[in-house]
């Protein structure tokens, strides 16, 4: 039933093929238009100036020698990091003001607006930890989230998964003193620290001053396979 000469293409087939060619050409043209913009975005995500920024922060810490709470030291470090980074995604479980995890450079992620870098998780420590695992698995994002050390128990299943999956997820646990604070014994972490230290492939740091806090952030950011 083939009544055509060798290498002759019937018009019906040729016309359909041309339609596909036009569709492909349109896709290629669209890609060429957005390529330059995408290239800049992707390069910014892959590139970070963490080492340079943290080196400057260490010099400042030596010069100033201020006595600061480590959560305040962490905020100062984060403020420097978020001024240049496009892939640090911060957040807190309704304790941003206490954890000092939100900086002046952050923009809040809202429904319908995901072009930002800070999440208000609410009183949802377990959900926060699970979401951070998802962010780390999805792309080149480096998620970090804050809560009180006592509430690390709510995060424990996801923290363990971070370690098992070798994901760079950073947990900022403040208010780690065993001293009885204004919130009473329900907020008094006793066994939490030893429990976290028993998890394989989980780095647990407890800095004493601003310099150690900067070093902790540097190590956490460099540890690509360890939460």
List where the protein language model places each region.
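Conserved thiamine diphosphate
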Residues: 120-227
């Amino acid at each position: 039933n083939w009544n055509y000469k060798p290498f002759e293409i019937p018009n019906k087939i040729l016309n359909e093929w041309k339609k596909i060619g036009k569709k492909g050409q349109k896709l290629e043209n669209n890609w060429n238009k957005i390529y330059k913009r995408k290239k800049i975005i992707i390069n910014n995500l892959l590139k970070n100036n963490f080492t340079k920024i943290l080196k400057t922060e260490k010099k400042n810490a030596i010069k100033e020698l201020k006595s600061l709470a480590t959560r305040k030291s962490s905020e100062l470090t984060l403020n420097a990091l978020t001024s240049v980074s496009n892939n640090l995604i911060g957040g807190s479980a309704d304790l941003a003001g206490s954890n000092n995890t939100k900086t002046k450079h952050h923009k809040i992620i809202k429904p319908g607006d995901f072009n930002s870098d800070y999440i208000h998780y609410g009183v949802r420590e377990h959900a926060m930890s699970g979401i951070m695992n998802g962010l780390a698995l999805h792309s080149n994002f480096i998620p970090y989230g804050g809560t009180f050390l006592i509430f690390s128990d709510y995060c424990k299943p996801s923290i363990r998964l971070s370690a098992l999956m070798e994901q760079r997820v950073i947990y900022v646990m403040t208010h780690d003193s065993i001293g009885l604070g204004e919130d009473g014994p329900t907020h008094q972490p006793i066994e939490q620290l030893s429990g976290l230290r028993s998890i394989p492939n989980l780095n647990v740091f407890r800095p004493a001053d601003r310099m150690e806090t900067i070093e902790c952030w540097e190590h956490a950011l460099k540890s690509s396979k360890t939460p």
